[in-house]
UniProtKB/Swiss-Prot annotation:
It is found in: Nucleus. Probable transcriptional regulator involved in developmental processes. May act as a transcriptional repressor (Potential). Involved in two major neuronal regionalization processes: primary anteroposterior (AP) axis patterning of the CNS and segmentation of the cranial neuronal crest (CNS) development. GO terms for cellular component: nucleus. Residues 1-110, 140-197, 271-300, 365-394, 472-524, 850-877 are annotated as: Disordered. Residues 271-286, 497-524 have a biased composition (Basic and acidic residues). This is Teashirt homolog 1-A. Residues 143-197 have a biased composition (Low complexity). Residues 57-71, 853-862 have a biased composition (Polar residues). One of its GO terms (biological process) is regulation of transcription by RNA polymerase II. It comes from Xenopus laevis (African clawed frog). Transmembrane segments: none annotated. Residues 885-955 bind DNA.
Amino acid sequence: MPRRKQQAPRRSAAYVPEEELKAADIEEDNLEDDGLSLDVQDSEYLYNDEHEIKETPSYQNSPISSATNQDAGYGSPFSETSDHLADFKSTSSKEGQDKEDGQNTENVSYPTDSLAQIKAVYTNLLSECCWSNLALDLKKSNENSSPTTNTNKSSMSEATGSTSDPDTPTTIPSSSCTNTSTSISVTTSNSTNSNSASGYDWHQAALAKTLQQTSYGLLPEPSLFSTVQLYRQSNKIYGSVFTGASRFKCKDCSAAYDTLVELTVHMNETGHYRDDNKDRDAERTKRWSKPRKRSLMEMEGKEDAQKVLKCMYCGHSFESLQDLSVHMIKTKHYQKVPLKEPVPAITKLIPSTKKRALQDIALPDSPEQAGISPGASVSESAKDPKAANPYVTPNNRYGYQNGASYTWQFEARKAQILKCMECGSSHDSLQQLTAHMMVTGHFLKVTNSASKKGKQLVMDAVIEEKIQSIPLPPTTHARLPGSYIKKQPDSPTGSTHSEEKKDPEKEKVNNCEVEKRIKEENEDPEKIEPATLYQYLREEDLDTSPKGGLDILKSLENTVSSAISKAQNGAPSWGGYPSIHAAYQLPGTVKALQPSVQSVQIQPSYAISVKTMTPDHNSLIHSPGSLTPPTHRSNVSAMEELVEKVTGKINIKKEEKVLEKEMVIPAKPPSPVAKENKEILKAEEANGKVLKKSNEADIQKPKKETPIEPHALNGTEPLKAKVTNGCSSLGIITDHSPEPSFINPLSALQSIMNTHLGKVSKPVSPSLDPLAMLYKISNSMLDKPIYPTTPVKQVESIERYYYEDSDQPIDLTKSKNKPFVTSITDHVSSPLRESALMDISDMVKNLTGRLTPKSSTPSTVSEKSDADGSSFEEAMDELSPVHKRKGRQSNWNPQHLLILQAQFASSLRETAEGKYIMSDLGPQERVNISKFTGLSMTTISHWLANVKYQLRRTGGTKFLKNLDTGHPVFFCNDCASQFRTASTYIGHLETHLGFSLKDLSKHSLNRIQEQQNVTKVITNKALSSVGGLIEEDSSSTFQCKLCNRTFASKHAVKLHLSKTHGKSPEDHVIYVTELRKQ
């Protein structure tokens, strides 16, 4: 049996005889037997109907009832199905029915057609007494014209209307079933006590038409939801009159009651309050739990409910959310739901008529191909009834049929689903993909690229195809099938069209090269030798595949990624470090003349590893993370030229000639890019080096070489000597901090360009190429080295790199020093360049503010110098404490912390019991601290509040422990001394500061300004000795127009404006006056 027969709605005891209620209870008991067939139960149910009808008065001679089925012209399908039963209803008195009750019921021949039973049921429903008032006028008009030949047939329908339809999804309002003798005054004399009246023709005719036109395709075997497809009708067909007037309804059987007491009595009698979810395995295929529940299928429609209330693991649909929840809890399927495949973005943008064709192309071949596409119809998926799944819905948005087919698809397409969106590498599990994302930082790239959707339409479609459709699963060693490549899921930018248009021959070439690289990569993974020639890409490999350049570079990215993972797993192949963390430790001493080039692994937001190669291999190996945004055609054309050049299509002599022409006549923006790259290749080949390039190096260089355009515009020569910036020394390696170390990719690439360009110098006229803007960005973001000042020697390119030992980690949070050193000291520093660099600096800070972790060293105000050493850094820390960068205490000026800690210790009050009580600093003390340190009152308040919170929560902070125990211990940050009393601690801190806290108010801002001026003089001397470029005139100071305070640098004024006055740094021109010193 497909489902349990639904019980008839119960009427209130005030309107239904007790015998009828008892009969209904007997009927419910009979329906509990689930082993009977559909026909037997239906006949049994009709028997119960007949039993109730015989106890109810019947009025066959009514002219209204005789007109029930004949006027609409539908051939009275209901009366035909009732012929067998009408013969037993010829008696018009209740007594006659009682006499014949025991004699005739066993001889009744019942219809076996379930559709005919449904029609009979609805006939009974529509002849209910509650409709008589509404249809009175219609009945009057039909009285005279209707024949009376079918009186017995229609009166049977009326009589059975005294019982409710057991299959209707709504409730008959019992309050309307009153004595209607006054309303039916037009009937014959027999209609004196009418508890059951006639139905109407218009509604019955409409229902007959609906039933005749509806075809119910029965499956050969009953399924879980066949009853829903067969019997359940939406209540929207009948309008709002079926909603019922009673307020209290039984959820199980939909019986309606006027009072809560009656509903409670019903619940107790029938046990309908019990939980029906106790399905036994044997019964699960025969019936369904909670059949009368008001479900989403009734309210919203069957298909929508099946789409929403579907188990993602096994594919079963459910009538209500409660059933789905019970299923999930019982089967634990919520723990087994696999990773859902990404929905192609292209399907959201195209009409549904085109979705099927795209899905046929995009999905891999599978046994369920015909039924899994979102646009597929039910008829397609049900061509083979035994293969078709009964849970398939027409609008299956998840693209699978059931648990088995979905699992098959997931396994078959796991390499595509668990794929890094950035580099295309596939993984065997979600954990491996997560680890890959964390190691490479690709999650940041994907996030950033996803936020820039819609801005990448400038790229050539052909190049977009090449870039987005490169299948590179480095963890897959077997040859990939052709359908795997053709039908991979869309990338986040939606590349379905590009995949359809890809050239299959080019795919073959690319895939061969990819597999070749993968095999080379995995041939000897455990070798420790850093100089293994065939482990990385060679120029010979590039020569063999002129068309597959992009794929080769992409494969090299994966090779480098695998090297990183090996390093983290303890089996490095590049430097002999036991782990990647050991690579961050500074060696004790490094030979000064060691010419090795340090190659920095660059990521979008931080450095993954630092590789130190032997002197024989000055190779630059970069990570997969490419910082190039594909936003301009010139980038693409430059890349194409670069690939052609690397593959040997253009010889070097021709490049030299073009380079000479380029010095005189500036051409299109991509041209100088390619020419300089060719010059780089020539220089490297002349030195006999084995060049190992990566995608980042090749694609970023075009952006970094146009720097020379604005440089030459301002009358300066390009770089001729290697600068002691971050990428030329181990000083770039930072110590361990809670956050990942950040190496500026732009500055690292600039140093690479400095390395390769060496003595290349050519003046180029400025062009409108947006690539030129990146030069300014790189200038403003170059990392600051912290080394003792040493003059940079003009030596040959092989001996230009020195490793300088320094204990001080580099401050990577400020882009204040741009170390550019040239052999020409007569440079021009134009105001235009100065202001442009400041604007670019502001823009870069806005772009990279959240990605830049805070440094563990104190940062300083000055951002105006182009080169600096650690001695000047320390001097400025001591002498210019104004406007420090606020944040964690690790970024604070130690002097400021000493002052704040001393003031806090002085505010502690000792009680008679020997304990200390925290008291707040007075406003005057705060003002004194603010005047001396330059810290805002808000910053001071926040620091104090943070210290108090830590003391209350844990009883201690960095400089004070055990305050709550009555035996506090004070710690000095400078010398790690410990003190037991606040007075001795304050005295000790004053010795570090060099003055007493009482004298703090005597120090004015003028003293601080003088110290800044002294620092400026020292810095200027250092810059003149190094010959660096100075952005600002050393004889100028800047005054805030709002408060008339003066500052030594523009950046200090802008910090002041933003922190003190809340002004945007971009508005500094409005609020700043530049003062020239005489």
